[in-house]
Swiss-Prot record:
Keywords: Autocatalytic cleavage, DNA damage, DNA repair, DNA replication, DNA-binding, Hydrolase, Repressor, SOS response, Transcription, Transcription regulation. The record marks A107, G108 as: Cleavage. The lineage of its organism: Bacteria, Pseudomonadati, Pseudomonadota, Betaproteobacteria, Burkholderiales. Its EC number is 3.4.21.88. Residues 31-51 bind DNA. This is LexA repressor.
Amino acid sequence: MLDSPKLTARQQQILDLIQTAIARTGAPPTRAEIAAEFGFKSANAAEEHLQALARKGVIELVSGTSRGIRLRGEAVRSINAARGTQFHLPIPGISQLMLPLIGRVAAGSPILAEEHVDQTYSVEGSLFQHKPDYLLKVRGMSMRDAGIMDGDLLAVQSTREARNGQIIVARLGDEVTVKRLRRTAGAIELLPENPDYPIITVQPGESFEIEGLAVGLIRNTMLM
């Protein structure tokens, strides 16, 4: 195992916040959210701590997105082991879930149909606050600003219900998409988290179903 990076108390607190946010919401916090959590006067103070964590090899900062923070698995596991804690990163052999990875979904067939399962992953159960039923490989960058990148594995709990503002897996016509749900008095909208992509409005009479709720996110590189 790698030597554990030496963190200051504040750096450790920020790392814990990042891990908790990813486990609970599927996305890392923004600089503004970190600043608010710790009472910093500006997001710049949060950025300085993130830069320090990046220099120590604990995280990777992704430019162009407010949630562009990626955990570096080996370094974080080393820190958690040194602290005697087992946090939210998958560690083989501990409380494992066997989750099917869903590839492309054929029109009109159930997401969990056998022909859609590319492979099965063993994933640590404590990574998730709510137990997922499957992993869905993210295609494209429409949810970039929520920290969901192309190639990531979205952990999904099968459900037909979701609250306003939650990130869902939706079936719209023959397409399956990951978007943020917004219900208004007269419409259902599927919101991207990237200004380069349009808002999708569900038209009256159009086939629409909620297939699942995002309950976590795994960087594809963590499972290689």
